Structures are given as structure tokens and as C-alpha cells.
Amino acid sequence: MDKENKMDILNNQIFLLLLITLIGMTIGKINIKNFSLDSSAIIFVGLFFGHFGYTLPKTFQTLGLVLFIYSIGLQAGPGFFFSLRQRGLKLSLGTVAIIGIGFLTTLATTYLFHFSAGTSAGIFTGALTSTPGLAVAVEIAGGQNAPAAYGVTYFFGIVGVIVFIQIIPKILNITVKDEEQALNKERDKTHKPLHFMHLELTNLNLVDRQVKHLNLKSISPVIITRLLRKNGTEPILVGGQTILQAGDHLRITGTKDDLEMMQMYLGTPVDQDIEFERVLSGEYITVSNKDICGMSLKQLNCHEVFNVQLSRISRNGIELPAGPNLRLHMGDTIHAVGSKQSLENIKKIFGNSIKDSYNFNILPIFTGLFLGFILGKIPLYIPFSGIFYLGTTGGVLIAGLFLSNIYKTGPLIWAIPSNANSFIREMGLVLFMATIGTQTGTSILATLRHEGLQLSLAGILVTTVPLISSVFICKHLLKLPFLSMLGVITGAMTSTPGLATMAKISKTPYATSSYATVYPVALISMIIYTKLLIFIVERFF
């Protein structure tokens, strides 16, 4: 193949897309001391090819943008609304405030260096390492300024968080082990560890009464899980309809104080442990039956109907208690306890097919995209500013957020399995990053020659000012524990390398759980702040 033919093949758009993706993904996998570019390497490879005149069509960019943002909405939906309630509210406020500091710092650098709206948005999203924010910037501001600025400032965002996480314990004179022990003690106060004990029923006033009529919760929040009849050989799973008999051996779960109180109410402890596992067994069952997806455990009433007790549910790697109001999702893994025959019966209801749990219907995805597109075209009036449109990104994002939270409408299951969502997100990201890289590459050197120093300085400021401010916000205003503060900071910066660094500092789940709580809020906040940034710069700067 001569040189001319080699150049001709680079003009083939499919070949160019595949080549940029392969090189970019390969470079992105290179990890040096927790630093890696991941999928963002694609945009840098695209810049290289774009500089030499090889570009991809904008239709690739638009398609990738829509797929990527919609998948973000589907992923973040349930977690986003959950984070706005209870414990997550304080963490979410910290996240919004940290990103807000980055937003204000970007406005200051824009005023100082006279950046355009696109460049300003690129600095903001690059310094805070937000690809969804960049996607919004490209759609609204257009042109090549945003991706070029993103490419320059992204490096500072990645390195800045890693260095900050490593040095902040020393600056604040924090001993991580002491912080872990303090949080463990606090956890034990609010969430006392559960124990179990075995009692023989000696209170004759409770004989021949159903468990649901004992009003146990009004006395002490314990649960009678299983019993063994006097002289019996087979254990029984206890439910509300179970009738107690004199001499029953009961297995009760609760805190130590609650269990001691139950001794006065129910009976005397049994010294010899009762071997309940002789007949009963536990299995993990996969939800793959779409007909029960969206139903609550209370609706299924597994204990009364199938004589099976559900203890916990694993969803996307997270363990959830099997509460009565918990709704089942496709792909959930349920830990169930019962007899072999009962477990076989309930498997037929849940499906228990890993292969089927990976299946998904393409119709809800395109329906959601269509609804999002329509939503983005609806004119909204903002006082003193005129007509405002959500745009394609805003429309599909809101559609994804709400539809995934609804989960199911009739036969349509809006949420999709995590593996399918990851595929759609990565495919959209590849199309978007590769295209925007090649489009920007044609003018990247001119941008660097003209504004390279200003962009670098702005990137450093927009990364470091929010990080430094985060200590005051989280530690002094919100009174967050140190490890929770680390989770909020890395979550607000949407920094996966920062998360890896944080995990090395502390093996406990406190920091990572805070990260998981605020991450959906950070994704949505970055998109909203980016829209607002462009709006302000275009009209007032």
C-alpha cells in the first residue's frame, strides 16, 4: 500500500473513527501512579488527527451526545432523587457549593482574560473533569473553543485532585486511623450491631396467638425469624400468621439491649444453639422476569405465599435491606432462605436467569430519547431573560432522570441493566469525543499560541480554588467528618483517579459511600452550571 492509498483510507470516516478509538482507549488504559486519561484520551488522539485535516462528521457528534447524556440520566436518576433526601442533603449541599466556587472562579478568569463563552465553558468543565458538562458546552456554544480549552485544563483537574487528596491529611494534621475509629464509634451509637439469641417460649399468655398480634415493635424492635416446635425436627420460618405454642424454641434478632428485654416478655434463653440449617438453605436468586419488575416485596408477599424469607438484595454491587417497600429491578440478586422446594417455587416467579437479566428492549430507549428531544424544543419563559430552551442535552437528561426514577410504565421498563447502560454510555462517549477532537484539532495550535498561557493559568485557578474552599465548606460550615469530606470533594470533581487515591488512604467505606451519594448530584449540577455559565457570559461579558 503506497503513501497515497494510506492517506485515502484515513478519509474513510468509519476507519478513522475506529482508529482514533483504538489508539485513544489504549492510551487511556495506561496507568501511572493512579493517573490515567481513561476515555478522555480519545479527544487528544482526535486533536492530533484533526490537526492534519482528518475530521469526522458532526452527525457522529450529535448521535454520541444524545446517547451519552441520556445514559447519564438513566444512571443518575434514582441516586439523584435519593441524594436530595435525608442524610444525602448535607453532602449534596457541599457538592453544589464546591462546584459553585468553580463556577464563580471561572467567571472571574473569564472577566480577567476576556474569554469567549465557549472557552469559558471548556475551562470550567476541563478543570472539574466533567465530560457531560463539555457535551452541553459544545451543543450550546458550538465552535471549537470549548473542546480546546477542555483539552488544556483537563490535565490540571486530574492531577490537582490526586495531589490534594494526598496532602490534605498532612496539612490539617489529621490521623486517618483516628478518624476511622471515631466514625466507627458514631456508627455503633446510631446503628447498633445486630445479634441473635434463642429463647424457649414460657409466657403462657402468648400461647396460641399469631406473631402479628404480639405487638413486638411496641415493646422492642426485634424480629422472630425462625422457630422449632417442642420435640420437632423441622424448623419453621416465622411470619405474621405463625401461631406460637408452649415450648417453642425461637430465634430472635435485635440489639443486645432489645434481646435482654425480650427475655422478660417471651421466655428463657436456650443454652444449646439450635441448628436451624438442617432443613432450610439459602440461595441467591436473580430477578429476570420482567413482569415482576417494579413490584414491591410487599406486593409479592413471599413469606406468606411461598414460605421463603428474603434477607437482602444486591443491586449494581450495592447491598440493600429487603424492606417491604423496596421495588425490584431487572438484574437484582436476592438472598432467599427456605426449604429446597420453596426456593425452587420462588425461582419460577423471579426468573433466576442471568442471561435473561441482561436482555433489554430497545423501544423504551428510543421512546425516552424521542420524549427528551421534544422536551428540549419546548420554549420556557424566564423573567427578564426571555425565551429559554432546554436543548437536546437538557431534554434527554431530564427524560432519563425522571423515567429511570419511575422505572416502569405498563409494559415499558425505562431503566436498563447496568451493563447495557455502560455500553450505551461508552458508545456515545466514543462518538462524541472522537468527533469533537477532530473538529477542534484543526485550530488547536492557533488557540494555544493565542491563549495557551491564559488557559493554563485559568485551569490551575479553577481547579485549586474550589479544592481549597472545599475544606472550609465541608469542615467548618457543614461539620462533615474528614473521610466524608474527602468523598464529597472527589465526587464534586467527578474524579475517578481521585477516588482510587482516596481508597488507598482509607479502606473503610465512609469516603467511598459519600462519593457514591454525591456523584449523581455532581453530574447534574455540572450540566446546569455549564448552561448558566454560557448564558451569563454571552449576555453580560
Curated annotation (Swiss-Prot):
Residue stretches spanning the membrane: 10-32, 39-57, 62-84, 91-113, 146-168, 357-375, 385-407, 428-447, 452-474, 481-500, 515-537
Protein name, entry field: Uncharacterized transporter DP0976
Record keywords, A-Z: Cell membrane, Membrane, Repeat, Transmembrane, Transmembrane helix, Transport
Classification lineage: Bacteria, Pseudomonadati, Thermodesulfobacteriota, Desulfobulbia, Desulfobulbales
Keyword Glycosyltransferase annotated: no
Membrane topology according to the record: Multi-pass membrane protein
RCK C-terminal domain: residues covered: 183-260, 268-352
Family: Belongs to the AAE transporter (TC 2.A.81) family.
GO CC entries: plasma membrane
An annotated GO BP: potassium ion transport
InterPro entries: AAE_transporter, MFS_trans_sf, RCK_C, RCK_C_sf, YidE_YbjL
MF (Gene Ontology): monoatomic cation transmembrane transporter activity
SUPFAM superfamilies the record matches: MFS general substrate transporter, TrkA C-terminal domain-like
Taxonomic source organism: Desulfotalea psychrophila (strain LSv54 / DSM 12343)
Compartments (UniProt record): Cell membrane
Recorded superkingdom: Bacteria
